[in-house]
Design a protein with these regions (language model features):
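NAD(P)+-binding Rossmann beta1-loop-alpha1 motif at the extreme N-terminus of oxidoreductases
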Residues: 1-40
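Rossmann-like NAD(P)(H) cofactor-binding subdomain of soluble oxidoreductases
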Residues: 20-21, 25, 37-92
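Conserved beta-strand segments of alpha/beta enzyme cores
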Residues: 30-32, 63, 75, 117
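Predominantly flavin-linked oxidoreductase catalytic cores and closely associated redox partners
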Residues: 82-87, 91, 102-104, 179-187
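Internal alpha-helical scaffold of NAD(P)-dependent oxidoreductase catalytic cores
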Residues: 90-175, 215
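Interdomain hinge/lid region at the active-site interface
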Residues: 168-217
Length: 217
């Protein structure tokens, strides 16, 4: 009989949230995955809620890296994958990985093996970086979900996939064309349509509509 020698993990991911599960699935035997109450040896990746990072980091000083894009903890390096995790291994080729502090070279390579593209992010720019990420991800989702809720409230039930195909097509166009991929009345300077659309919206959506529409003027 042929015996298989178990592979010793190169590092341990602490936290079984969506990020921890996704990275563990992608790295396979290279990474262990434990609940955040565990105290493993070796290099530890803190994949825990932001509010828990500072306290846990004290238990692994000098041998941990956290994933929180919003936090800078002096002496605790950060590797923040600029993506939205769902707990599954995905194709992350070309996804930025923001590095702040002395992330070990081996861990940089491990992220690179998954397709992430590392870049150095100064600590003082993390709040701006994180705000840009929230605008792109959380706020974009809020706009889409809010727009569908506005329609449902007036009895408009869109068939099929609702507004999602429009959102996907818009992202494809902007990815391919940059600012030239933008369309709509604000791009055309159609003030009559802008006024009618704004009048149809309740607050705060009316103000959001007008502010965002003119934000790139």
């Amino acid at each position: 009989l042929r015996h298989t020698i178990p592979m010793t993990p190169e590092f341990t991911i602490l936290g079984r949230g969506r990020a921890g599960r996704a990275l563990a699935a992608a790295w396979g035997p290279r990474a262990g995955l434990l609940d955040h109450g565990a105290r493993p040896d070796g290099l530890v990746i803190l994949a825990v809620p932001d509010r828990a990072v500072a306290e846990l980091a004290q238990a692994f000083l000098g041998r941990c890296v956290h994933l929180a894009g919003s936090l800078h903890l002096p002496g605790v390096p950060c590797a923040h994958p600029l993506t939205s995790f769902d707990g599954q291994a995905r194709d992350w080729k070309g996804t930025p990985l923001a590095i702040t502090g002395a992330v070990p070279d081996g861990l940089r390579r491990a992220f690179g093996d998954l397709g992430f593209a590392a870049f150095d992010l100064p600590a003082e720019l993390k709040p701006l970086y994180h705000a840009a990420a929230v605008l792109t991800s959380g706020h974009a989702a809020s706009l889409w979900l809010g727009a569908e809720a506005l329609l449902r409230a007036r009895g408009v039930a869109l068939p099929g996939r609702g507004l999602l195909p429009l959102a996907e097509a818009t992202l494809r166009n902007v990815a391919a064309l940059g600012s030239a991929g933008r369309t709509g009345p604000f791009v055309r300077g159609d003030e009559a349509t802008i006024a009618r659309d704004a009048e149809a919206l309740p607050e705060p959506w009316r103000d959001i509509f007008l502010t965002l529409g003119r934000s790139l003027d």
